[in-house]
């Protein structure tokens, strides 16, 4: 069994914000798997699905971004899952907009949701699907930038990026992060 976590903030006011791209990917992954977020546990919405041969719980923590790790840590402990069973999808300021990258470990890069997950699972050594949102304009607070909504004209690019992130997540679940990284990151570099 695997746990896929899309990071974001609950509430309609955060829909379509850069910081909620993890929720968007989780929603699309569940939709493609024919699953729905019908379970509520660990202060999170959960959808049970199958990705290839793997049973997967897709999670959207409802704790707000900075406390996402509480839900993730509780779920890992309850299901007795290891870090190799965890895939976290989140926005990333350090990647160009719409670029998708899969990595294992590394720092949180100032992302408070990732920082919280690291603290509550005891390590950064889990798979992360990073979805690039780019840097804010000069003199703009990064918090205001990530809480800003994607522009209407960005729909096509965002949809394509979400599909790439869903595919990266699926590969990480089915192949394991190490094997999946070669495919995902090669495609991401080729798209530049």
Swiss-Prot record:
One of the protein's GO biological processes: protein quality control for misfolded or incompletely synthesized proteins
* Keyword Acyltransferase attached: no
- The primary location reported for this protein is cytoplasm
Sorted alphabetically, the keyword list is: Cytoplasm, Hydrolase, RNA-binding, tRNA-binding
Where are the residues marked Discriminates between blocked and unblocked aminoacyl-tRNA as a site? 9
Reactions performed catalytically: an N-acyl-L-alpha-aminoacyl-tRNA + H2O = an N-acyl-L-amino acid + a tRNA + H(+)
Q: What is the lineage of its organism?
A: Bacteria, Pseudomonadati, Myxococcota, Myxococcia, Myxococcales
List residues binding tRNA: 14, 64, 66, 112
From the record, what ranges are coiled-coil?
Answer: none
Quote the subunit structure annotation.
Answer: Monomer.
Q: Under which name does UniProt file this protein? A: Peptidyl-tRNA hydrolase
Q: Would you identify the family this protein belongs to, as annotated?
A: Belongs to the PTH family.
Checking Pfam families in the record gives: Pept_tRNA_hydro
Name its species: Anaeromyxobacter sp. (strain K)
* UniProt GO cellular component terms: cytoplasm
Q: What is this enzyme's EC?
A: 3.1.1.29
Q: Name one GO molecular function term.
A: tRNA binding
Q: Which NCBIfam families match?
A: pth (TIGR00447)
Localization:
Cytoplasm
The function of this protein is: Hydrolyzes ribosome-free peptidyl-tRNAs (with 1 or more amino acids incorporated), which drop off the ribosome during protein synthesis, or as a result of ribosome stalling. Catalyzes the release of premature peptidyl moieties from peptidyl-tRNA molecules trapped in stalled 50S ribosomal subunits, and thus maintains levels of free tRNAs and 50S ribosomes.
């Amino acid at each position: 069994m695997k746990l896929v976590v899309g990071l974001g903030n609950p509430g309609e006011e955060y829909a379509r914000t850069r910081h909620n791209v993890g929720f968007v990917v989780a929603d699309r992954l569940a939709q493609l798997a024919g699953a729905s977020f019908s379970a509520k546990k660990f202060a999170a919405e959960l959808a049970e699905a199958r990705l290839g041969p793997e049973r997967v719980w897709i999670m959207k923590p409802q704790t707000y971004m900075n406390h996402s790790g509480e839900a993730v840590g509780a779920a890992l402990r309850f299901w007795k899952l290891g870090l190799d069973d965890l895939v976290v999808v989140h926005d990333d300021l350090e990647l160009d907009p719409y670029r998708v990258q899969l990595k294992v470990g590394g720092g949180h890069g100032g992302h408070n949701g990732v920082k919280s997950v690291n603290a509550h699972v005891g390590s950064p050594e889990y798979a992360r699907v990073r979805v690039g949102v780019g840097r804010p304009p000069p003199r703009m607070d990064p918090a205001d930038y990530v809480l800003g909504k994607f522009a209407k004209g960005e729909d096509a690019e965002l949809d394509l990026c979400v599909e790439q992130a869903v595919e990266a997540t699926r590969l990480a679940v089915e192949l394991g992060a190490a094997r999946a990284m070669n495919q995902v990151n090669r495609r991401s570099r080729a798209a530049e």
